[in-house]
């Protein structure tokens, strides 16, 4: 089967670039519990969603969730990159792909993390839900990242660890891969899939 020719590759942040796919359940809620937060998990998830849509600042989020004592830099220390992601990004950049990230995230945290790990050296285009008030899988989010990449959906590959987001991308005409599935759960496996199925335009 001939390889598909693409111009852009768009990666999700949590669960693809970063190791933890459920950052709320795996990182945020435990962090807040350690700070004495008494809210239910459901209430924390609601506050996070509001913050990820740009309706709350992180200062407002921390006050609502647990009062003084929690802050952005402290929380973001718990995140780590997926093993092998930087070498793969460097290879994709060198191959001439236009790289972007489409993520449902809090703006301040997204900025802190990409600066901490030096991701903008490889991924210059970011659509963060809090910055635009739009979360995946809404079609407008995908339209925004394609616009930033200056290419049409049919020339873009989208990689995400959530099935609903992958399906939404496909409905818009994008190529899409569901990361985290058997045979596609490491950067080496993603590299191999990219080599077998895609080539730069």
Give the role of each language-model region.
Residues 1-9, 90, 106-107, 111-201:
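Asp-based, Mg2+/Mn2+-dependent phosphohydrolase catalytic module
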Residues 2-46, 171-172:
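Active-site neighborhood of HAD-like aspartate-dependent phosphohydrolases
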Residues 12-15, 54, 101, 126, ...:
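Generic structural signal for small/hydrophobic residues in well-ordered secondary structure
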Residues 20-21, 84, 105:
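Acidic donor-diphosphate engagement hotspot in glycosyltransferases and nucleotidyltransferases
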Residues 28-37, 47-50, 72-83:
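Helical cap/lid subdomains and adjacent loops of hydrolase enzymes that gate the active-site channel
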Residues 45-73:
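A metal-dependent, Asp-based hydrolase signature
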Residues 72-100, 139:
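Short, acidic loop-to-helix structural element flanking the phosphoryl-transfer center
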């Amino acid at each position: 089967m001939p390889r598909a020719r693409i111009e852009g590759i768009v990666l999700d942040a949590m669960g693809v670039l970063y190791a933890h796919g459920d950052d709320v359940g795996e990182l945020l809620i435990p962090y807040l519990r350690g700070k004495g937060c008494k809210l239910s998990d459901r209430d924390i998830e609601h506050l996070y969603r509001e913050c990820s849509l740009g309706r709350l600042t992180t200062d407002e989020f921390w006050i609502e969730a647990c009062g003084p004592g929690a802050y952005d830099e402290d929380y973001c220390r718990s995140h780590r990159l997926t093993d092998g992601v930087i070498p793969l990004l460097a290879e994709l950049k060198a191959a001439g792909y236009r790289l972007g990230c489409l993520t449902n995230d809090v703006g301040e945290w997204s900025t802190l993390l990409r600066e901490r790990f030096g991701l903008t050296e490889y991924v210059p285009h970011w659509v963060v839900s809090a910055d635009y008030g739009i979360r995946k899988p809404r079609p407008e989010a995908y339209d925004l990242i394609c616009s930033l990449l200056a290419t049409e959906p049919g020339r873009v590959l989208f990689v995400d660890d959530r099935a609903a987001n992958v399906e939404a991308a496909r409905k818009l005409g994008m190529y899409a891969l569901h990361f985290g599935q058997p045979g596609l759960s490491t950067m080496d496996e993603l590299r191999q899939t990219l080599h077998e199925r895609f080539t730069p335009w």
